[in-house]
Amino acid sequence: MQVIGSAMEPEKHHDYHLLPDSESALPVGNDLKNGRRRERATESESHKSKHPEGTPVHRKAYLNKFALSGAILASTNSILLGYDIGVMSGAVLFIRENLNISSTQIEILVGSLNVCSLIGSLASGKTSDCIGRRYTIVLAAATFLIGAILMGLAPSFSFLMAGRVVAGIGVGYSLMIAPLYVAELSPALTRGFLTSLPEVFINVGILLGYISNYTLSSLPQYMNWRLMLGLAAFPAIAVAVGVLAMPESPRWLVMKGRLGEAKQVLIKISETKEEAELRLADMVKAASFSGHVSASSSSSNWHGQGVWKELLLTPSRPIRRILIAAIGVNFFMQASGNDAVIYYSPEVFRDAGIHNKKHLVGVTVIMGIAKTFFVLLSALFLDRFGRRPLLLLGSAGMAISLAGLGLGSKFLEYSNSNPDWAIALCVVAVCAAVSFFSIGLGPITWVYSSEIFPMRLRAQGSSLAISVNRLVSGVLAMTFLSISRKITFGAMFFALAGMMAVGTVFFYYYLPETKGKSLEEIGALFEDEVDENPKALLS
């Protein structure tokens, strides 16, 4: 087992009792809040803790092979969105000429997938609570597969739009369910790394899209863009087949009262059987506190009823804080303009003075390599340094990079000679902006959205936050070119830099650190400390 990091807080001691094998004997806590106060720093806050028998042992972050395999298979779903983002940046160059469509139609075509993914995001929470996390992943892949086939065979703009709509719904399902499933499967000390894998695979997909553009761009125009879009069907098929080897989320199984199955999954994804029993006890306590399962139950008819009311109509103060944090980080993720910059990167580089199509596509490959490298780097250190430091570094770096891009673009607007240094500044600034995004907002948004909601609200709370993500992304994708041409690219990038500066302040004040805490413990950050000390979110 590979060690990737460990928490470095002082030693704290906690005594535990093993669970008997009988499900009916599982302990049920009626006071989850007080229980959290007593047990806040178990495996998550201590470098050393006590083994269930009471013997002190080192708690190290290890990569469980079974959890890693499940995380990789689920995250493969995210390649679908990444590939579409990357491939569309080059495909639109040929679609515009082949189908003879306007810039406005291009914006609608590009943005439609993100807007329609809102449908999948909103529906995914209820769907995953009803049919399970695994089968929601299958549904996402199957829906995107149909969309990819429609796009690859599209004879006209309207047919192509139909494919984008269907694929968008599949992307919406995928964006919510992949990080949620991985978060519920992962041990606390490696959850940051494993839950950031969907973003890693998004970047792998973007890079594959860029490579596809570069490789297929020399084919006849009527064929190249159709192949670029149609190739997305292959990862969708791989996901649908790979899900057969994935376990169901143990937390979903607990909510459905299937405690025996949950225990078997936990034994596979835990270091020891004792650890599995302790994790199961925490899950049962959280579920029974919500009234979804009792210790003696073997089944449950819970399907997520009453969740929207609790989230939107009668939220408690802690839930409001969680909503603000989750929606805020998703809003700023897309308000950064990252997706729009990637979608329209050839237009951005063309405005910077690069006009050869092959060169335009080639520069995007370099950008894709930079994004993929830095998201891998961030994922490896997420559980060592924590969410907040990387998020603040990434957002502040984006603000500076976008300001530099705005400066270079503004200079080129007023220059007749297009000096090489200004062109180089724009290229470097774009690569820096997407790299800082990959360090911070890219992976951490998915990690944070999937881990801060309590068990009963996690699926639909995540779907609500990610729906905001999709809406902002779609609006920006549909308006980026029009606004940029009206106020200039330079002014647009200065506006995005300002947005990232505001986002950095928001993250500093409203997002607490969740590194190393179990999903059941994270709620204490919003429930206990915040109630007792309003400034606790700053720590």
Predicted regions and their residues:
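Alpha-helical transmembrane bundle of multi-pass membrane proteins
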Residues: 2-271, 278, 288-539
